[in-house]
Every structure is written in structure tokens, then in C-alpha cells.
């Protein structure tokens, strides 16, 4: 006799699906960001390792991923973020999160980052994680 077992999809797939659904249903949320030069964040400060460790930790705790790395974030083109764009390095990368505490931690750990927040999706920022790259 065959046995049927229900399998649970990996947490990363579930998180991606949930985030996709939120984005497609115009779920308005506040996004916080830490912005730095690509050279600093991707080369001088190996921050990708920190993000990998954080993703692993979230997976073990079955927590929904609430942070993303966005190279050349499109949200900086929104009129309300003109001041941040003027201060941003030409080649930049953002750590974006719906968790303000995480961005505060990033700021404390890295120091040389610009932080801020925005609401999305909106007319000016239809996709909070869109990249110009």
C-alpha cells in the first residue's frame, strides 16, 4: 500500500510567495532602508555574509524574510526621496526591510550608511524592491 505524505515547501519558497502576494495585492507597507556605496557594502564590508547568516537564522525560526538587498534601488527616483538621492553615492546598494529595528542594527554595525523610510506600493514607488541595474 502506498503512503502519502504531505511535504512542506522550503521556508524560502513560502516567504517569496507571501511577499509576491503582498506586492500584487497593493498591500501598503513602510519600508526602511540603509544605503551605501556598492564598493563599501559589497567589497570592503562583506555584508553578504551577514545577510546569509540572518536568512539561515530566519529559516530555522520559520520567520518570514523581511529584508532584501537591492542594487541601484529604483525607489530613490521617487520625488519624496530626492534629498536622499542627492546624498547617495552614484553606484549604490540598499538593504531594505519592513523591520525598522533591523535597519537600526545595520546603521549601528556599519556606521557609514544613509538611512530612511518610504511607503510602498505607491504611484511613485510601485515596486519597493525594483532595481535600476
Swiss-Prot record:
InterPro entries referenced in this protein's UniProt entry, alphabetically: Ycf54 (IPR019616), Ycf54-like_sf (IPR038409)
Superkingdom as given in the UniProt entry: Bacteria
Family statement drawn from the similarity comment of this UniProt entry: Belongs to the ycf54 family.
Classification via PANTHER family: PTHR35319, YCF54
Protein name (database record): Ycf54-like protein
Source organism: Synechocystis sp. (strain ATCC 27184 / PCC 6803 / Kazusa)
Lineage: Bacteria, Bacillati, Cyanobacteriota, Cyanophyceae, Synechococcales
Amino acid at each position: 500500500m502506498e503512503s502519502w505524505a504531505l511535504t512542506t515547501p522550503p521556508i524560502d519558497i513560502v516567504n517569496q510567495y507571501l511577499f509576491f502576494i503582498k506586492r500584487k495585492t497593493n498591500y501598503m507597507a513602510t519600508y526602511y532602508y540603509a544605503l551605501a556605496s556598492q564598493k563599501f557594502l559589497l567589497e570592503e564590508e562583506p555584508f553578504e555574509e551577514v545577510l546569509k547568516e540572518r536568512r539561515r537564522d530566519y529559516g530555522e525560526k520559520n520567520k518570514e524574510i523581511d529584508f532584501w538587498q537591492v542594487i541601484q534601488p529604483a525607489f530613490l527616483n521617487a520625488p519624496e526621496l530626492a534629498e536622499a538621492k542627492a546624498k547617495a553615492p552614484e553606484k549604490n546598494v540598499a538593504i531594505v526591510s519592513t523591520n525598522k529595528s533591523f535597519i537600526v542594527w545595520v546603521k549601528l554595525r556599519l556606521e557609514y550608511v544613509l538611512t530612511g523610510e518610504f511607503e510602498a506600493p505607491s504611484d511613485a514607488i510601485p515596486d519597493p524592491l525594483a532595481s535600476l541595474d
